[in-house]
Amino acid sequence: DWRTSVINECLELEKNTGIKGNWVKLTDMWRQNYMPSMDKVRNGEREWVNLDTLHKESLIKILKELNINGLSEKNLNHLNTAWHRLSPWSDTVEGLNLLKSNYSISTLSNGGIDLLTNMANKQKLPWDNVFSAETFMHYKPDSETYLGAVEKLNCETHEVMLVAAHNNDLLSAKSYGLKTAFVLRATEYGENQDFDLKAENEIDVSA
């Protein structure tokens, strides 16, 4: 639950430093910069950098735009790693453990290996493997990320299922031959979310 988690991290920062800001707007703007920042890597405008670097660049820009000043470098770096400390949805850990009883379960995220490992350790997420865009030096939806995970698992594409809350991610995986499952997160982007409220018809399973 990235949105609630990051907003809470911002509020904790305000409590500790006295620096005030529109933290809901900052969080939403930060997420809005997510895909555009990765696209510059994907289209060759810049060399590979991991998501922590992209997140920090976006954060610095947004802080200036919102006129939020006075953060020390230490506070800035701590806020930037809020993405390492996200809290899971209430059904996540139980659901992963149920899946793990019958299947091998892995991440396939644009987050870095360090980010995913920190999150797993903090929240007791029982991954068998941690696959990241950093593993393949490609951000989703590049084919190298999806197919790279399939290769690492020593599987055929039809033997691997991507489970996600985002139709665009699932449709990309589907286009490369993976099975797909949609999990609804109706408030991921806030109470007024108006997309990713149901699976597209092409998705194999809707949970």
Predicted regions, residues:
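Substrate-recognition element of Asp-dependent hydrolases with the DxDx(T/V) motif
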Residues: 73-122, 130-133
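Alpha-helical elements of Rossmann-like donor-binding domains used by nucleotide-donor carbohydrate transfer enzymes
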Residues: 5-12, 29, 57-61, 78, ...
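Asp-based, Mg2+/Mn2+-dependent phosphohydrolase catalytic module
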Residues: 97, 111-207
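Short helix-capping segments at alpha-helix termini
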Residues: 15-23, 65-71, 123-126, 154
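A structural signal for well-ordered alpha-helical segments within the folded catalytic domains
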Residues: 4, 53-57, 144, 171
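A generic structural motif
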Residues: 19, 102-104, 178
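Active-site neighborhood of HAD-like aspartate-dependent phosphohydrolases
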Residues: 1-32
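A metal-dependent, Asp-based hydrolase signature
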Residues: 24, 29-77
